[in-house]
Amino acid sequence: MDKKPLDVLISATGLWMSRTGTLHKIKHHEVSRSKIYIEMACGDHLVVNNSRSCRTARAFRHHKYRKTCKRCRVSDEDINNFLTRSTESKNSVKVRVVSAPKVKKAMPKSVSRAPKPLENSVSAKASTNTSRSVPSPAKSTPNSSVPASAPAPSLTRSQLDRVEALLSPEDKISLNMAKPFRELEPELVTRRKNDFQRLYTNDREDYLGKLERDITKFFVDRGFLEIKSPILIPAEYVERMGINNDTELSKQIFRVDKNLCLRPMLAPTLYNYLRKLDRILPGPIKIFEVGPCYRKESDGKEHLEEFTMVNFCQMGSGCTRENLEALIKEFLDYLEIDFEIVGDSCMVYGDTLDIMHGDLELSSAVVGPVSLDREWGIDKPWIGAGFGLERLLKVMHGFKNIKRASRSESYYNGISTNL
């Protein structure tokens, strides 16, 4: 099925969805050659790329949202229209809303685990993020005598969680034909202990720390100045980034007191460095920073409350989209990560370039100037992008859950430490 452009999707529903998954009612919109100009019922205005592959278009096609804008007063009829998929024969089929975070339901001990999700938990390889279809298992018959087609042993919810925590991407275990838990669990524990022994003997480098060092070398070798800025920043910096109390992102800020907060991003201090270094150094000014950031993110496989970012930017000459895309390509080729670039928009910068690996967003990149620059005394063209290191590690090592790549006491280099 062909992917419909964004203007067709919003025209069909009369709704817009923000990056936080909030549904807004559209009061008026106009479509130019490549842009959509949108006025929401709540009074907000937006200019976005008319893309087939942006995050909002994907969410519209999958009929996913988190909540509705209270000021827009989205009606039940509007929501039902959003949740209804029209076929070519004009038949309507209701689809289920999938909201994040996903709630796991407890499984009774007497219930056997369904084959499909079990297969998914072990089918990923470290070198690829390609989705695979899982064949349906053959139905067993009373007279069946073939051991391979026998049903899987029953697993309780706690046993299932334990097995998933012990599995690694390299394990070639089909869980719908697995051994009983009392045999499988000690076998996996032994494998993980052997992994730790090899790691301690041969490597001893933490994945996250090594990636930070590799990224630092990449940018320093290309003429970028490394920055190390404070983790505690003035709350005023967040407001100057356009994050006021009325925005969803404001609710994600870890505030220490009324004047200080943990930085949710690296951009504010990099803005300050660009302005100050422009008075000192010849152009173009090229800087980068690798460091931790903090947000009250929803729990899930793609988000962390403490995460590590790399932001790089260049100001002055040579700040074109072509040069930005070339640098991003060189960076991700250096890390051996496949990607594609699609247009999108965000609350802070407006138009952005999303760097995607499959359905996983690795980065948002910007070609300045943007209206926000005036708040920071920047009046020259610039380019920049930010990447989450844990997401990069998730792709590089084939982890199912981003927590395996994070600062953690439960995992080391993706290996469970609870052995």
Swiss-Prot record:
**Disordered: where is this region?**
100-157
> Where's it found, cell-wise?
Cytoplasm
- Skewed-composition ranges (Polar residues): 120-141
Q: What class of enzyme is it?
A: ligase
Q: Which reaction does it catalyse?
A: tRNA(Pyl) + L-pyrrolysine + ATP = L-pyrrolysyl-tRNA(Pyl) + AMP + diphosphate
> What keywords were assigned to this record?
Aminoacyl-tRNA synthetase, ATP-binding, Cytoplasm, Ligase, Nucleotide-binding, Protein biosynthesis
The answer on whether this UniProt entry bears the keyword Cytoplasm reads yes
Mark out the compositionally biased spans (Low complexity). Answer: 142-154
Where is this protein primarily located? cytoplasm
Give EC number(s), comma-separated.
6.1.1.26
For this protein, the parts annotated as crossing the membrane are none
* Molecular function, one GO term: ATP binding
Question: Which GO cellular component term is one of those annotated?
Answer: cytoplasm
Please give the InterPro entries that the UniProt record associates with this protein: aa-tRNA-synth_II, aa-tRNA-synth_II/BPL/LPL, Phenylalanyl-tRNA_Synthase, Pyrrolysyl-tRNA_ligase, Pyrrolysyl-tRNA_ligase_C, Pyrrolysyl-tRNA_ligase_N
Gene Ontology BP terms: tRNA aminoacylation for protein translation
As for what it does, the entry says: Catalyzes the attachment of pyrrolysine to tRNA(Pyl). Pyrrolysine is a lysine derivative encoded by the termination codon UAG.
Provide the protein name.
Pyrrolysine--tRNA ligase
